Amino acid sequence: MLYRPFGSTGLTLSALGFGCGSIGGLMVRGAYPDMRKTVARAIELGVTYFDTASMYGVGQSEVNLGAVLRELGQEPNSDIIVGTKVRLKTDEMTHIEHAITTSVEASLRRLGRESVDLIQYHNRIGPNRTAADPEANLDDLAQIVQTFEKLKKAGKVRFWGITALGETDALHAAVDQGGFHSIQSAFNLLNPSAARPVAADFPYQNYDGLINRAAARGMGVIAIRVLAGGALSGASERHPVAAPSVNPIASAPTYETDVQQARAFQFLIDEGVVENLVEAAIRFVISHEAVSTALVGTSNLEQLELAATYAGRGPLPEEVLGRL
């Protein structure tokens, strides 16, 4: 397993992170013995970062991850780094500190921990606070950071970050304002714009080098949607435990279109560079040195084993990257 520094936190993360969300689905809808077996194997393979959220399975992912880690003897302050997230509703934006504190304390109870290594703000960033899924503006972020700082003083969190989804200009402004330790950013073969220049007529959201900007400011970078919700497998079929449908982020309007677009990378298989598109997707993301960890959700042990194998093969050759 490869390891990367997590920004300026002093933490070191495995290049492959273990996603506990609904898309892969294992930690939300899987059988508990399968969860335990897969998490245990991930730790054996050198995975050190596990990412969950209060909204995954309405808290069930946190409950399951916490129970498995305790059963495996992985207590806080071990080499295992746990991150979770807080998401606010529209009516909670008027009392941010109270809402975040309440949410974090509930997450800690579900995880069965007194503290969490990384807490992340899970709402979009932008000017619209009246939407059903309210965005946070720069003033909100300043208050959110102050709340996280208080939670750190109370011994409930160690570090904090944001999920960098929303308007591109607002995301860059948030990174420039700073005050947090990390970002999660969509970055994959279908939309590499968070790290690489794209054409003026690029059809999807252009993140305009966001993760480069964050890394330059000492922030850790967690790449999300590494497999575009599974579309970068090149197959439409979903595992029974996985989310039955996926809403694309910063790529095509539909999952099926993403699957079709993924097949454009078939040449990497034909040339013997990779075994399959999943390998191409994972190795592409970890080829970018600003990425601290590539977050991949799994549905079963086999998928985890393959993801770890592919991550262990390291970045794609420079010559290949130049053609992508």
Task: Put a short name on every predicted segment.
Residues G21-P33, V86-A99, D133:
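Active-site mouth loops of central-metabolism enzymes
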Residues E62-T84, D140-G155:
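Alpha-helix-loop-beta-strand connector modules within alpha/beta enzyme cores
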